[in-house]
Each structure stands twice: as structure tokens, then as C-alpha cells.
A protein has these predicted regions:
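N-terminal glycine-rich phosphate/pyrophosphate-binding loop and immediately adjacent elements
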Residues: 3-145
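Core beta-strand elements of the Rossmann-like FAD/NAD(P) dinucleotide-binding domain
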Residues: 4-6, 275-285
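Alpha-helix capping and helix-loop boundary segments enriched in small/acidic/polar residues
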Residues: 12, 56-57, 207, 211, ...
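Generic recognition of stable, solvent-exposed alpha-helical segments in well-folded globular domains
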Residues: 13, 19, 121, 176, ...
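Short acidic/polar mixed-charge low-complexity motifs
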Residues: 53, 95-97, 269, 277-280
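Rossmann-like flavin
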Residues: 94-212
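Helical element adjacent to the flavin cofactor pocket in flavoenzyme catalytic cores
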Residues: 218-270, 274
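Flavin (primarily FAD) binding-site architecture
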Residues: 288-289
């Protein structure tokens, strides 16, 4: 195993690992991604289940592709396109009076004027909190108590952002953060289809239910993507393929069928990884995605 202190190994070629690897390479690091599967993508893959028919095998909708990532990595030229954006949610009713929920309107299902008004306030509040979370997600988390100037500025910005919500909304976000989607939706709405559609959008793919703790935060996290719901042309595999293409263009080496069995240490520092076949890859940094 040769000395490669400037080398970074990223474990896992899912979308998070590929984005991480691409940004590290963009910053001038020498990066290798190791993936146990035969292809990159993780849960964002497209599979052919019958000759000529393909489907997204796990994740099937794109919620949170940050526009900065899309631009920084030139994903549009790397193969990413969409067959549909700003998708609507439909909640089916037994009597055929289905509910149709778009970004700006709710129709059908005998929605009352009270629920329509409540929906406007709900969207205003959740949208405001999501925009706050979006700003926080795009900052380097400040280290509390470090005394570092940048950390102190980061903490001040975070405190100011929360304070700028105003007293009422600030109290409301503190309250909502500790309860669940079910309780919030019960407070705001009467229509069961509307509550079902909103709770599904909030917890889909999160291994949570509407009554689970932190399910409100999960919904806010999804809304903080700020781009709405999109359907990639060719399935979710095209997202991973575009990320892999962008990463490789930046010099990232992607190795598939390369399962990591352990992270290697030298004293109290990481020095590489060992693969299933016994091969060792030296690295000054290891990122597990």
C-alpha cells in the first residue's frame, strides 16, 4: 500500500457519494469512489424488468436536486433531463371525486373554503420555514464554542435568520419541530384526502409515518429543495449516470464491484480502506456515504 496522503476514498457511489466526490475533485483532490454493486447509483437506478421496459427500481421521484449542484457539475450537459417537473399529487377517492394538489392550488374532493384558506396559511408557513432550512443547509455548520471568527459569524447569521421570522413564526417553528405531521394536519385541515396527500408527500421514502417524531422536519427538509417534484427522463438512473459522468469528467475514478470490508487506521488517523478481495487503497481521507 503506497503513501497517498492527498488521496480521498469515497465509499459508496450513490447520489450523495457521487456529489461529494465531484466536489472534492473540483477542489483539486485526487478521488476514488468504491462501490460494492456492479454499477453506480445506489437507490437511484433504472432497471429493465422486461425487454424494452425500464423502471426506477427504488427512488422514483427527484425532490431535492439543489440548483447550485446542477450548475456547478453541469448536469444538463452530463445527460440529465426531465420528462416532467412541478408534478401534481393526486389522492384517489372511492366516489371518483379525486383530490388534485399542485404547487399553488388544491382542487376536487369537495374541499371546503375553510380548508382552502387553511391551505394558504399552511403553505405560507411551511414555505417560510423551508426557505430558512435551505439557507442553513447551504452553510458550513458553525462549531459552537470554537472561538473561530468564521464560526462566530455563522452562528450570528443563523440566529439572525431565526429572529427575522418574527416572534409568532419563530415560536411556531420551535413548536412544530418537536411534533409530527399527523398533529399538525389535524390542527389545520378537515378533509381526509387532503391530510393524506400532505402527509404522504412529507414522509415518502423516509421510513417514518405521519405520527412519527420529526416527520414535520422531514417534510420541511423535502420542501427545502426548493425545486418541486420532478420525474427524470429515463428514470432515476439518469440522475446517477449524469452525476457519475460529471465526476469522471472532473477526474474521479469510480470502481464498481469493490466492496469495502474495513477502514484502515494508522494510530488514531485514517490511512485507507481494505476491499473484500484483500486489496488495500491508501488515502489520507475516507468519506463513507
Amino acid at each position: 500500500m503506497t503513501d497517498m496522503n492527498d488521496h480521498v476514498v469515497v465509499i459508496g457511489a450513490g447520489h450523495n457519494g457521487l456529489v461529494c466526490a465531484a466536489y472534492l475533485a473540483r477542489a483539486g483532490r485526487n478521488v476514488t469512489v468504491v462501490e460494492a454493486a456492479e454499477h453506480p447509483g445506489g437507490a437511484a437506478i433504472t432497471r429493465e424488468f422486461a425487454p424494452g421496459f425500464k423502471v426506477s427500481a427504488a427512488a422514483h421521484l427527484l425532490y431535492m436536486l439543489d440548483e447550485n449542484v446542477r450548475k456547478d457539475l453541469s448536469l444538463d450537459t452530463a445527460g440529465l433531463s426531465f420528462s416532467q417537473q412541478d408534478m401534481k399529487t393526486t389522492a384517489l377517492a372511492e366516489d371518483g371525486n379525486h383530490l388534485l394538489m399542485s404547487k399553488n392550488a388544491v382542487q376536487g374532493a369537495n374541499i371546503s373554503s375553510e380548508d382552502q384558506a387553511a391551505m394558504q396559511e399552511y403553505r405560507r408557513l411551511m414555505g417560510r420555514f423551508a426557505r430558512l432550512l435551505h439557507r442553513l443547509n447551504n452553510r458550513i455548520p458553525p462549531r459552537v464554542g470554537s472561538g473561530n471568527r468564521d464560526d462566530m459569524i455563522g452562528l450570528a447569521k443563523t440566529a439572525l435568520d431565526i429572529r427575522m421570522l418574527g416572534r409568532q413564526d419563530m415560536r411556531e417553528i420551535m413548536r412544530m419541530a418537536g411534533i409530527n405531521m399527523y398533529d399538525i394536519l389535524q390542527e389545520y385541515f378537515e378533509n381526509p384526502l387532503l391530510k393524506g396527500a400532505l402527509s404522504m408527500d412529507g414522509v415518502l421514502g423516509a421510513k417514518l409515518g405521519p405520527r412519527s417524531n420529526n416527520s414535520v422536519f422531514c417534510a420541511l427538509h423535502r420542501l427545502s429543495g426548493m425545486q418541486g417534484t420532478a420525474l427524470p427522463a429515463g428514470g432515476m438512473g439518469t440522475v446517477s449516470n449524469a452525476l457519475a459522468n460529471a465526476a469522471q469528467k472532473l477526474g474521479v475514478k469510480i470502481r464498481t464491484s469493490a466492496a469495502v470490508t474495513r477502514v484502515l487506521l494508522q494510530g488514531d488517523r485514517v490511512c485507507g480502506v481494505e476491499l473484500e478481495d484483500g486489496e488495500r487503497i491508501a488515502a489520507g481521507m475516507v468519506v463513507s456515504s
